[in-house]
Regions:
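C-terminal beta-strand-loop-alpha-helix "lid" module of Rossmann-like NAD(P)-dependent dehydrogenases
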Residues: 168-219
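Active-site helix of classical SDR
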Residues: 115, 151-154
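A short, exposed helix-loop element centered on a Lys and neighboring polar residues
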Residues: 115-116, 160
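Substrate-binding pocket helix/loop in short-chain dehydrogenase/reductase
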Residues: 91-92, 99-101
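Conserved glycine-rich cofactor-binding loop
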Residues: 13-14
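Rossmann-fold cofactor-recognition segment
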Residues: 46-60
Length: 277
């Protein structure tokens, strides 16, 4: 059995996943990092990280991942960091059922499948940590993010319910809720909105053009955006603290959003959000 604590981290091609995989490896963890494409393996393997192929939309790859990790570690899985996701932008009325379903396949159903597959290993050990990289948009909705909002709100519900159900088992569940973080997330969102939204024939065409200008870099820059190390700080706490928190809200805008949601009347709060989307 592996002597080092074992963690599975998903979505490690770039951004938060890649950074956290490297940081945990340097901090003494045995890291199993997942990517969807073989060409993304080399950079991680060069750091001494064990890399496996996994796609949340393909159940057979999820099952194979868990089987392979268990085989290599003698059945030890100490932690899971669900991180791989993407954001489908677009007005709710412009999101087809097929596009919405794909958003949930990646951001919710795949996460649920993987989580449920590692829990039996953690139960046998009498301990474990499950951390979901959610989003501030799982707590505070933004316009033109309905599909992504919905997937993260669903994840919040599943995650906190699971935390409550696992109380006393030695398995702790935490949700990390970042605001703007430097990553390839925006570039991926841009690709999906162009592929799945009929922009020119939408009642929201003018707003789409404004948002595309921002996503493509000709709009205002978000001065509150942090690097992935901000996520790692809270991930490390969630993995190692005796009493990990249920929620870790990251970045100033995210913390402000949570506070204002608590303090303001709902109608005023939602009107205020229109100024920041």
């Amino acid at each position: 059995m592996s002597e080092k604590p074992v963690i599975i981290i998903t979505g490690c091609s770039t951004g938060i996943g890649a950074y956290c995989a490297g940081a945990l490896h340097r901090d003494g963890w045995r890291v199993f990092a997942t990517v969807r494409r073989t060409e993304d393996m080399a950079a991680l393997e060069g750091q001494g990280i064990e890399v496996l192929i996994m796609d949340y939309t393909r159940a057979e790859t999820i099952a194979a991942l868990v089987d392979e990790v268990a085989a290599r570690t003698g059945g030890r899985i100490d932690a899971l960091f669900n991180n791989g996701a993407y954001g489908q932008a677009g007005a709710v009325e412009d999101i087809s059922v097929a596009v919405l379903r794909q958003q949930f396949e990646t951001n919710v159903f795949g996460w649920h499948d993987l989580t449920c597959r590692v829990i039996p290993f953690m139960r046998r050990q009498g301990r474990g940590r499950i951390v979901h990289c959610s989003s501030i948009l799982g707590l505070v909705p933004y316009r033109y993010r309905g599909a992504y909002n919905a997937s993260k709100f669903a994840l919040e519900g599943l995650g906190i319910t699971l935390r409550m159900e696992l109380e006393g088992s030695g398995i702790h569940v935490s949700l990390i809720e970042p605001g703007p973080i430097a990553s390839n997330f925006t570039a991926t969102a841009l690709k999906h909105i162009k592929a799945n939204i009929d922009i020119e024939n939408s009642a929201h065409a003018q707003e789409y053009r404004r948002q595309l200008a921002r996503l493509e870099g000709s709009g205002p820059v978000n001065k509150h955006k942090l690097g992935p190390e901000a996520v790692y700080k809270d991930l490390h706490h969630a993995l190692t603290a005796r009493r990990p928190k249920p929620h870790y809200v990251i970045t100033t805008p995210a913390k402000q959003g949570v506070l204002l949601k608590r303090l303001l009347p709902a109608s005023l709060f939602y009107r205020l959000l229109r100024k920041f989307d």
